[in-house]
UniProtKB/Swiss-Prot annotation:
Subunit structure: Interacts with host CD4. Interacts with host DC-SIGN (CD209). Interacts with Borrelia outer surface protein C (OspC).
Glycosylation (residues): 82, 93
Lineage: Eukaryota, Metazoa, Ecdysozoa, Arthropoda, Chelicerata
Major subcellular location class: secreted
UniProt protein name: Salivary protein 15 Iric-3
Signal is among the record's keywords: yes
Family under the similarity heading: Belongs to the salp15 family.
Expression by tissue: Expressed in salivary glands. Detected in fed adult female.
Function: Salivary tick protein that downregulates host immune system by binding to both dendritic cells, and CD4(+) T cells. Specifically binds to the CD4 coreceptor on T cells. This interaction prevents the activation of the Src kinase, Lck, and its downstream substrate Zap-70, and results in deficient activation of PLCgamma1, the repression of calcium fluxes triggered by T-cell antigen receptor (TCR) ligation, and a subsequent reduction in interleukin-2 production.
Length: 124
């Protein structure tokens, strides 16, 4: 019985943390140019030919959400070769297409012509 009560307390605390995080995300929705980092020091793992990493991440997140609360993206699960990204949702994950104007190569390739896109390995 004690473990059940402890589990309830942990769940309630977790809900408060999630709610606070969601509210702080809404407050930080302004997009400013970055060089791979955002205001909190988080560095994205997108290739250097993506000009504004934070704006790109926010764009993918908005495509992913489309009315669903609790969605997120993983910058390591963006496939520039196939022009797709992983949308992580509470109950199921989806692989969605990147916008056609997304850079997908160092020579100004875009996802409009997927056959010209090149793979990217973070750190290489």
């Amino acid at each position: 019985m004690e473990s059940f009560v402890a589990m309830k307390v942990v769940c309630i605390i977790l809900l408060f943390v999630i709610a606070a995080e969601a509210e702080s995300i809404n407050e930080k929705s302004d997009v400013e140019p970055s060089k791979g980092k955002n205001n909190s020091g988080l560095q994205f793992k997108f290739p250097p030919y993506v000009p504004n990493h934070k704006a790109f991440a926010l764009r993918l997140l908005s495509l992913c959400e489309q009315g669903i609360y609790g969605t997120k993206i993983n910058d390591l699960k963006v496939d520039f070769k196939n022009c797709t990204f992983l949308c992580i949702r509470k109950y199921e994950n989806l692989t969605l297409p990147l916008p056609e104007d997304t850079p997908c190569g160092p020579n100004n390739q875009t996802c409009h012509k997927k056959d010209e896109c090149v793979g990217y390995i973070p750190g290489c």
